[in-house]
Amino acid sequence: MDKELLKKLTDEGIELLKNLIRTPSVSRNEDKTAELIFNYLKDHGVADVRRHLNNVWAISKDFDANKPTILFNSHHDTVLPAKTYTRDPFSPDVEDGVLYGLGSNDAGGPAINLLTNFLYFYGRQLPYNLIVAITAEEENSGENGVMSILDKLPPIEFAVVGEPTCMEISVAEKGILVLDCTAHGKTGHAARNTGINAIYKALDDINWLRNYKFEKSSPWLGDVKCTVTGVNAGTLHNVIPAECTFMVDVRITEKYTHQEVLDIIRQNIPNKDTEVKPRSFKLKSSHIDENHPFIKLAAAKGFKLFGSPTTSDRAVMPYASLKMGPGDSNRSHTADEYILLSEIREGVEKTVELFEEFFGR
């Protein structure tokens, strides 16, 4: 490991992160941070840097189509700053080794980690091609984010998705299926024994969703989880409602497809006339085999493996992927977001060391 070069690149990456924090980049409004990242790669001598919308990616020097390709991907968009911030969310203040600012942790630190790794290995003779893509619209799962460039990339063997995981490696990640459901009844006067109360029918369905256990359980992600997150019915106190709508958040493991989960719910929900409509099948569960050579090496070197209940851009990738990066997901979307500079430095060094050994197998 060239520690002098790595320190230089890490220091420069931290300065880029400070500039990213200074530059608002809420989802769909990342044009200025995309420009910063594009110019940063160009300024470091990267020949092939590309941009589509607010997505920026760079390709290995001397790209060889006969070699497999690894994708490094993270995002540069942020959520809106929480109203409870006590600091300026766009001021990259450093105090006692702590860097504050919106996007510092999610996913600035992880993005800098992957950019620095790409630059460290740039121009070296490796058994793999590398592509680094720092993309937009991750926070809102937007169509103009990473999914808009997947067809512009060469075949990918596996992807490393940068998110704050305390440098642990997520080998599996739950997908999301949102269901809009409507229970049907019959209107009537509340004072009489007429009508069919759609709320009561919905309660039967909701209780079933709450208690149903899917047959297959994942060793990394546990069970499929259904959570009712919204209910709406009725407008007048004396009228039995003929409809009750409810919204369901379903977290899916790699053991099921979206269609399989939808079919099971439709076939087993107590009221067969209840409409169950999926919003999208886009955000799939993701997984990389724990016997994959990279995962086996990481585990042997002491990296902790885990299954993640939250989603990332892995959900739209059609190939094996893992999630890792400096920072802590518990800080994401919180007021006074921060990352430790030591987390970035140690994360970069650990990642470079891991890939050096992987490339040298």
Enumerate the predicted regions with their spans.
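Metal-dependent amide/peptide-bond hydrolase catalytic core
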Residues: 8, 171, 180-361
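Active-site nucleophile and cofactor-binding loops and adjacent substrate-binding regions
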Residues: 49, 99-107, 305-312
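Active-site metal-coordination/substrate-binding segment of hydrolases
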Residues: 67-131, 341
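Buried hydrophobic packing segments
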Residues: 37, 111-121, 146-149, 202-205, ...
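Acidic/histidine-rich catalytic neighborhood of metal-dependent amide-processing enzymes
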Residues: 108-178, 182, 218
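N-terminal helical capping/dimerization or prosegment-like subdomains
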Residues: 1-81, 243-247, 264, 341-352, ...
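Hydrophobic/aromatic beta-strand patches that form the interior of the parallel beta-sheet core
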Residues: 70-72, 133, 158-160, 322-324
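A structural signal for short hydrophobic beta-strand segments in well-ordered beta-sheet cores
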Residues: 49, 92-94, 228-231
